[in-house]
A protein has these predicted regions:
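Catalytic loop of the DD-peptidase/beta-lactamase superfamily, centered on the K-T-G motif
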Residues: 79-81, 85-163, 288-291, 297-301, ...
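Short, well-structured active-site flanking segments
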Residues: 183, 190-209, 290-318, 370-386
């Protein structure tokens, strides 16, 4: 017998003066479990996975981890209407009623890839992009009315290039969001090389005594977290921001430990890939505990100090703050900066394109770090630590594996990660075999208004002579 919630549902979410059509597709999979995807139609985001679909009597609920949201409410007696509340980190709670539909609204056809051209050398890439982005600059994502700014950094065979479009400057400071996770994994690798921790060490052993009970069986280790196979959820269930526009600011170590104490650190049998901000934030906090210093100080000591990344920080100095570009959620909605406390290791870094090129150059050539880096405190372990973070360790799916918080595309040999906050998006990629790296920093939150992922991948494809994703507005 089909579940009363199975079917196609359509509703409109009203938030911040704008309206978004949301569509749920729910069916029953093998074994009777409910499967669900969310479509944000007006944002052109389709097929976002749901989880924890539950029905009890006329009550129903589901979670959408990818957007840190979920819906709960009730099913009408005739089974045609879902009445309830959409709750999401940032916007908060909003009423959302959905009606049963006979047919789904399908995703529009994506723009065809731009034809392949011979590989473009670094000294010609900007002139090509100026032409390819002309429409976006005139009437699309980078048009003056959007307030958008984007800074691009490219390194190829040791040659570096930084340039900007829109409201950005070459030295603008951005939030890099979840690219921070790769820094946290590099700290882990550094501390392994320094014999301060082990990859297979239980995370419990790095937490204050009594925080969480030792499980009866296998427990979550540091490498489980660094490969996103810990089994921990994307976010803790005691995450209730006092200020939705700066949601992570008041989530401190006390709340984190309280949650972990309740959740436990038992490792599921054969845990699947499950992307978790909570887990990597916990890793950053745990490593800081072992090092005996706060995460920002540990980050500086192990990574950004030795690499000479002077414009990279968790908390900005006055001079960096003066270059911190305004972020946007939408063209009409400036975004508050995000300040991360206990979960800083998952997404708290701010940086510039030039500094990120120092980081990517180190990724490309761990065995060729400059003498000042090797001579710095903690610098001598960086070559081995960087190499450790590149080792492919688990499958993600669809030709993608994961190293230590770097995704690895099997077909191209590229490593990448992206990031997003309330007003910023970012994309970083490097390819050791072809010896190039790309970073794109954008002052728009991820979604329909962001160009970071698309532009970053496009540049990588142009550098290597592959058909390139369209930059059409």
């Amino acid at each position: 017998m089909a579940s009363p919630i199975a079917g196609i549902w359509l509703g409109t979410l009203h938030a911040g003066g704008s309206s978004l059509r949301l569509q749920l597709r729910i069916d029953t999979g093998n074994g009777g479990s409910l499967r669900c995807t969310l479509d944000s139609i007006d944002q052109k985001a389709f097929g976002i996975p749901c989880s924890d679909v539950k029905v009890s009597g006329d009550a129903a609920s589901l979670a959408v981890p990818a957007v840190r949201g979920g819906w709960s409410g009730s099913i009408s007696s005739d089974g045609k209407i879902l009445t309830g509340t959409w709750t999401q980190v940032g916007p908060g709670s909003m009423p959302l009623t959905l009606e049963r539909q006979q047919h789904a609204i399908e995703a529009p056809a994506s723009a065809a890839p731009m034809p392949a051209i011979p590989p473009v050398p670094i000294d010609q890439i900007k002139s090509l992009l100026d032409k390819e982005l002309a429409d976006a600059l005139a009437k699309g994502l980078l048009a003056p009315a959007t307030h958008a700014g984007v800074t691009v950094g490219i390194v190829q065979h040791g040659q570096k290039l930084v340039f900007s479009y829109g409201t950005a400057k070459d030295d603008s400071v951005y939030e890099i969001g979840s690219i921070t996770k790769t820094f946290t994994s590099l700290i882990l690798a550094q501390m392994v090389e320094q014999n301060k921790v082990r990859l297979d060490e239980p995370v419990r052993e790095l937490l204050p005594p009594g925080t969480v009970a030792k499980p009866a069986g296998a427990e979550i280790t540091l490498i489980d977290i660094s490969t996103q196979h810990s089994g921990l959820p994307r976010m803790p269930d005691n995450f209730h921001p006092a200020h939705p526009d700066n949601p992570y600011a008041d989530y401190d170590a006390k709340l984190l430990y309280e949650y972990i104490g309740k959740q436990g650190v038992a490792k599921p049998a054969n845990p699947p890939f499950l992307y978790s901000n909570l887990a990597v934030g916990l890793l950053g906090q745990a490593l800081a505990n072992r090092a005996g210093q706060p995460y920002p100080a540990l980050l500086k000591a192990e990574v950004i100090g030795p690499l000479g990344m002077k414009d990279t920080a968790i908390t900005l100095t006055p001079s960096l703050q003066a270059r911190f570009i305004q972020g946007y959620a939408t063209p009409q909605q400036p975004a508050h900066a995000w300040d991360l406390d206990a979960l800083a290791g998952a997404g708290g870094i701010r940086s510039t394109a030039a500094d990120m090129l120092l980081y990517l150059q180190a990724q490309l050539h761990p065995d060729q770090l400059p003498p000042p880096t090797l001579a710095a405190a903690n610098g001598k372990t960086l070559p081995a630590a960087l190499a450790m973070t590149h080792e492919v360790r688990a499958e993600v799916g669809d030709g993608v594996h994961i190293a230590m918080n770097w995704f690895h595309v099997d077909a191209t040999g590229s490593y990448w990660h992206n990031g997003g906050t309330g007003g910023f998006s970012s994309y970083a990629l490097f390819n050791p075999e072809k010896d190039f790296g790309v970073v794109v920093l954008n002052n728009y939150a991820p979604g329909d208004n962001s160009i970071a992922d698309k532009l970053g991948l496009h540049i990588a494809q142009r550098l290597t002579g592959l058909p390139a994703v369209s930059l059409a507005p």
